[in-house]
């Protein structure tokens, strides 16, 4: 058996529903959902890495590719070691990573992509409203500032959009 994680990738703009769809898939036996945002939020905010990630996200900027992939890889390995994710019996559902070609290249030695799902949205104002609601309900600080949200859309268009 391959050491690569069998993976489904969820792509889409901020607020397109990647996390929602990932959570739904993750509840189905045989699937495990892992959001890159959850990896970042799992960092201790007072740690050097936590402060660094918060600094980028509070400005609506992407965390550098090599750091993002390394943090993801360490987090995924911990999930396997703790028995939360079983690569032999579960398909990994990823959202928020990889965001660009550089991250995809860095992740080639970890994942075997079986399916790619692109969630297309056309109304940016509805996505802003969705992100603002999420900020209130899920205490997501990265979704509280509309200027930051709009910078995230611009980053998505520049770095990720097909």
Feature map (PLM): residue ranges:
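Hydrophobic/aromatic beta-strand patches that form the interior of the parallel beta-sheet core
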Residues: 8, 34, 115-117
